[in-house]
Regions:
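Gly/Ala-rich beta-loop-alpha elbow adjacent to hydrolase catalytic centers
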Residues: 194-198, 202
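Serine-hydrolase catalytic machinery in alpha/beta-hydrolase-like enzymes
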Residues: 87-170, 174-182
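The feature captures the conserved acid-bearing segment of alpha/beta-hydrolase catalytic domains
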Residues: 220-320
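Histidine-bearing beta->alpha loop at or near hydrolase active sites
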Residues: 324-330
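Alpha/beta-hydrolase fold nucleophile elbow
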Residues: 184-195
Length: 355
C-alpha cells in the first residue's frame, strides 16, 4: 500500500520494520517483555562517560517539582556536539524519560550524527532510580474527565488521574524554556513521543493543543483508558496546522495493546500504569481485573488503525499507522524509539512515513 498519507494512512507491516531482524528480535523477546518491568532500576545509559555516544552527544540533567509538589521530575538532555543549524536543532521530547533514556543506544545516536540532522533529545521522567513512577504517570499522562469530582484511573481507582493538561502546561511553560536556555531549538521541528499511557498523552496533546508540537509519535497508546475516552475527545479535535504529522505504532495484539481477549489482562497494578497486564496471580483484586477486562472490551482491536485512518482525513495532518508483527506491548517501548528518532531528525520526511 502506498506510503503517501495526505488522505489515507500508510499501513506498513512488520516485514518493513528495519528488515526481518527486528521482527525476529521482537518475537524472541516477547515472552520476557510482555510488558515493561515497572520495578526495574534504570541502570547504565548512553549518558555514562564511558559510552561511545559521548563522541556524538553531550548530556546533562536537572530536576523540578510539579506545581502541587506531589511529583518531582528529572529531565535528561542530550545535545549533539556539532554546531547547531542556522534555525536551531530539531528536538524530540520523550515521556517516561527514565525508561526512554535507558532504551536509547549509542549506535542510534552515532548513526544520527553520521547520517542526518541529529535532534536534541529531552527525556522527561521522574526523580527515582526506577524506570517508571506508576502513580505519577497515571496522573500526568491521562486526560481530565468531564463532570464533578476528581478523575481517577481506570484500573486502580485509588490513583488520581486526569492531569494531562497540567503536565502539558509544565512542558510548555517550564521545560521547553529551560531547554531553549541551554541549546538552540528550531520551534518548527518539535516532536513528542510516548508509549502506552505516554502514547495516550501524545494523542490528547494532538487533539487538544496540536500547535504544541509538529510531530506526534504514539507507541501502543492506551486507547482503552476510561472505556475509550480519547475517542470522545477525537470528536472535538482542534484544528491542526499544515505539516503536522502523526505516527502510531502498534504491537502484535490485533494492531494495538487493547485486545480484550489478550491473556495478559488480569494484573491491575500493571493495568493502572497503562500496560497490558501479565497472567493472573494469586492475590489479584478480581474487581480491578474485571474493570480492566470491561475497559478493553469497550475498544475494538482495530481501534488504532481506524483512528489513524480518520486522522488522515483531517486538513493539515499526515497520519501513518505501522504494525510491528510479533512485538508485545512492553517490547514496543524499545522498538519505537528508533522510528521516533527518525521522525524527529527529519529522516522520515514531513509525513512521518518510515523507510
Amino acid at each position: 500500500m502506498s506510503d503517501r498519507v495526505t488522505r489515507r494512512p500508510a499501513i506498513e507491516r512488520g516485514r518493513r520494520v528495519a528488515a526481518a531482524t527486528v521482527a525476529t528480535l521482537a518475537l524472541a523477546l516477547a515472552p520476557a517483555m510482555a510488558q515493561p518491568n515497572l520495578a526495574q532500576a534504570v541502570g547504565p545509559t548512553v549518558a555514562e562517560p564511558s559510552s561511545p555516544a559521548s563522541a556524538a552527544y553531550r548530556f546533562e540533567q536537572w530536576e523540578l517539582d510539579a506545581a502541587d509538589g506531589a511529583r518531582r521530575y528529572r529531565v535528561q538532555l542530550a545535545v549533539p556536539r556539532r554546531a547547531a543549524p542556522a534555525g536551531g536543532f530539531p528536538v524530540l521530547y520523550m515521556l517516561d524519560g527514565n525508561a526512554a533514556f535507558a532504551a536509547l543506544t549509542a549506535d542510534q545516536l552515532l548513526a544520527l550524527e553520521r547520517d542526518g540532522t541529529p535532534p536534541v533529545i529531552v527525556a522527561i521522567g521522574y526523580a527515582t532510580n526506577l524506570r517508571f513512577d506508576t502513580t505519577a504517570r497515571a496522573y500526568d499522562y491521562t486526560p481530565p474527565m468531564p463532570g464533578p469530582g476528581p478523575t481517577m484511573d481506570s484500573g486502580a481507582h485509588d490513583r488520581p488521574a486526569g492531569g494531562a493538561d497540567i503536565f502539558l502546561a509544565l512542558i510548555e511553560q517550564q521545560i521547553k524554556p529551560a531547554v531553549r536556555e541551554r541549546v538552540a531549538i528550531d520551534p518548527a521541528r518539535q516532536s513528542l513521543w510516548g508509549h502506552s499511557y505516554g502514547g495516550l498523552f501524545v494523542l490528547h496533546a494532538l487533539l487538544r493543543q496540536p500547535a504544541s508540537f509538529q510531530r506526534y509519535i504514539a507507541a501502543d497508546p492506551s486507547f482503552w483508558w476510561q472505556n475509550g475516552f480519547i475517542l470522545q475527545e477525537e470528536r472535538q479535535a482542534a484544528a491542526t496546522a499544515p505539516g503536522t504529522c502523526l505516527l502510531v505504532m502498534s504491537g502484535a495484539s490485533a494492531g494495538n495493546a487493547n485486545n480484550a481477549n489478550n491473556a495478559n489482562n488480569a494484573n491491575p497494578a500493571s493495568a493502572a500504569a497503562g500496560q497490558a497486564p501479565p497472567p493472573a496471580r494469586a492475590g489479584i483484586d478480581s474487581a480491578a481485573a474485571q474493570r480492566m477486562r470491561e475497559a478493553r472490551r469497550a475498544v475494538p482491536p482495530e481501534t488504532a488503525r481506524l483512528f489513524v485512518a480518520r486522522q488522515a482525513q483531517r486538513d493539515g495532518l499526515h497520519a501513518t499507522w505501522r504494525e510491528f508483527e510479533g512485538a508485545s506491548h512492553g517490547a514496543m517501548l524499545g522498538l519505537s524509539v528508533g522510528p521516533a528518532l527518525q521522525v524527529a531528525s527529519g529522516a522520515a520526511g514531513p509525513s512521518c512515513t518510515l523507510p
